[in-house]
Amino acid sequence: MSKPFFSIIVPAHNSAAYLPVCLRSIKNQSFKDYELIVVADACTDNTAKIANWYTDKIIETNYGRDGLARNVGIDAAEGDWLLFLDDDDWWIHEYVLDRLCHFATHTDADLLPFQFIWPNDAHGRYYWDHAKYGINIAPWSKMYRRSFVGDTRFSDAERTSDEAFAYGLIDKIERGEGKWFFIHELYYYYNYMRPGSQTEVHSHEQGTV
């Protein structure tokens, strides 16, 4: 059996109320050559059961850290390219994987950041373009060549887990071991306003390069 083009990794923690929206945005993609890996981490609800409606590749862990859960997903991934979604976020249309496949096959880049949008209760919505505002360290805002990631992993520190992964890969590029390509297209909805979300706790939008 051939390996998938994409491995999509979703760390999930007690997200039964939100996970279906996330996973439906993946299942609704017109491009189907992918594997979906849900890492149900330290869950006390029926997150794993809900995930089972969408994929048979579910890994249950008890770390209580989204970075370590992502590491488990990376280790299990078989695809040529890696993508991450947080359990309460979603892709904004059904052609995201089609577009990402296009850029993966028409560039020689290893790390490809794309635009995302998030809500703000005072000012409506904001969007992030890495080329304009700096490289945001959020792992879900990029596509990664699996061979380029290699043994780079997230740390076990709650507040700096994403930094370890992002800066490890940026260092590789600065050493000439990989290439960027900035995608000026909007793909990702970052559900920052959901109380208790992974992204709200870790304030991804604060970290830029």
Predicted regions and their residues:
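Conserved donor NDP-sugar-binding/catalytic core segment of glycosyltransferases
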Residues: 94-126
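Conserved nucleotide-sugar donor-binding catalytic segment
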Residues: 127-207
